[in-house]
From Swiss-Prot:
Disulfide bonds: none annotated. One of its GO terms (molecular function) is adenylosuccinate synthase activity. Belongs to the adenylosuccinate synthetase family. The gene is purA. Plays an important role in the de novo pathway of purine nucleotide biosynthesis. Catalyzes the first committed step in the biosynthesis of AMP from IMP. It is an enzyme of class 6 (ligase). IMP binds at residues 13-16, 38-41, 128, 142, 223, 238, 302. This is Adenylosuccinate synthetase. Pfam families: Adenylsucc_synt (PF00709). It is found in: Cytoplasm.
């Protein structure tokens, strides 16, 4: 009955797609439990590269059942685009299961997301503009539309009308936009529902039954710990819980069925969008890391902000997620550096802090306290045994492990699927 949770331990883009695909070939189900198509991950198989946004990474593994859980907000149009794109490349998507209780991103959610972000100006959050936040807001305000609502025309019309009543007032009076038509929106959603219906299931029941039968389920989180609405750098966060606890609420599986929690971290740190980032690099160093790591968002194409490894962030991620293992990715990107700084603590207004400040004013004022380690020049992409890594590279990994307080079980040494060093198995 292994239930394995896989989460990002930083601000996202850590390489969860590669880690999920590594584990996903050995599991029976891969379930997304939060977020929507604002999460981008790339899976590389041989010469093929698959950019996924809404679908679980396990869709690439033919013997795995991919599941979109109730905690995900689903944009049907994006889902179908992604399915069509994969099927045109020979990937079978008929195995996909979508929770009947998942909330829908309607066209008006995307409109509201974009006009609100523009209206905020310099106070913007840095959203992807894909309607994620407004859809989650409707969920909390109890005016959201769920997947099963798409199959009852009269019921759906009533729900759309209720949802648009206040939104149209805002669009017209606050944002000087035209109101959204209730009938047109209902008809559009009904058509999307017709195509979605074959994939819809009671996924909580499916996953619990699978675990009770001794099958292995991988719970895949979108975004990452530092973007969690409760535990991240609020307000510069996403609208859901990408931390390990979200795996339970986002799939309807109880915590006693979780046996492993795996955090994915880069050997350095990146962030997209607004918000504090203590180890952020500017100038030539930041440009070098961005170029070496090809650091551009899968979902947005935006250049990622880059910085040195932050052990305070990783310790915090280990704490709030209860990490049992770390997958360290993109270690190869650091090849060629003579010295590699890593952040071991913060200076906050003259005081050393080894823990994560929860006050965002303090976190914004945090200055990294660095220690420096010698780098390496050797190509490590073909190394498959930890002991065959350059000594200075081994020392760097061991120091990250020591500072994070959690064992590093897998190391990514390049972009390909087989560019890994597996120290410990991630499946019991």
């Amino acid at each position: 009955m292994p239930g394995i949770v896989l989460i990002g331990a930083q601000w996202g883009d850590e390489g969860k797609g590669k880690a999920t695909d590594l584990i996903g070939t050995k599991v029976d189900y891969v379930a997304r439990f939060n977020g929507g198509n604002n999460a981008g991950h790339t899976v590389v198989v041989g010469d093929e590269s698959y950019a996924l946004h809404l679908l679980p990474s396990g869709i690439i593994s033919p013997n795995t059942t991919p599941v979109i859980g109730n905690g995900v907000v689903v944009d049907p149009e994006v889902l179908f685009q992604e399915i069509d794109g994969l099927e045109s490349r020979g990937v079978d998507c008929s195995r996909l299961l979508v929770s009947e209780s998942a909330h829908i991103i309607a066209p008006y959610h995307r409109v509201l997301d974009k006009v609100t972000e523009r209206f905020l100006g310099k106070h913007k959050i840095g959203t992807t503009g894909r309607g994620i936040g407004p859809a989650y807001a409707d969920k909390i305000n109890r005016v959201g539309i769920r997947v099963h609502d798409l199959f009852n025309a009269e019921h759906l019309h009533d729900k759309v009308e209720a949802s648009l009543h206040q939104k149209n007032q805002m669009l017209v009076k606050l944002y000087n936009r035209r109101p959204i038509d209730v009938d047109e929106t209902t008809d559009e959603l009904l058509k999307l529902g017709e195509r979605l219906k074959p994939y819809v299931a009671n996924t909580s029941l499916v996953l619990n039954k699978a675990l009770d039968e001794g099958k292995t389920v991988l719970f895949e989180g979108g975004q990452a710990t530092m973007l969690d609405v409760d535990h991240g750098t609020y307000p510069f966060v996403t609208s859901s819980n990408p931390t390990a606890g979200g795996a339970c609420t986002g799939t309807g599986v109880g915590p006693t069925k979780i046996t492993r929690v795996v955090g994915v971290s880069k050997a350095y740190v990146t962030r997209v969008g607004e918000g504090p980032f203590p180890t952020e690099l500017f100038g030539e160093e930041g440009e070098w890391l961005r170029a070496q790591g090809h650091e551009y968002g899968v979902t947005t194409g935006r250049p990622r902000r880059c910085g040195w490894f932050d052990a305070v962030v990783n310790r915090y991620a280990a704490q709030v997620n209860g990490l049992t293992d770390i997958v360290l990715t993109k270690l190869d990107v650091l090849t060629g550096l003579k010295e590699i700084p890593l952040c071991v603590a913060y200076d906050v207004n003259g005081e050393r802090r080894d823990d994560m400040p929860t006050d965002q004013a303090e976190f914004a004022a945090a200055k990294p306290i660095y220690e420096s380690m010698p780098g390496w020049d050797e190509d490590i992409s073909q190394v498959h045994d930890f002991n065959d890594l350059p000594k200075t590279c081994q020392d760097y990994v061991k120091r990250l492990e020591e500072l994070s307080g959690c064992r590093i079980s897998v190391i990514g040494t390049g972009p390909q699927r087989d560019h890994i060093i597996q120290i410990n198995s991630l499946i019991d």
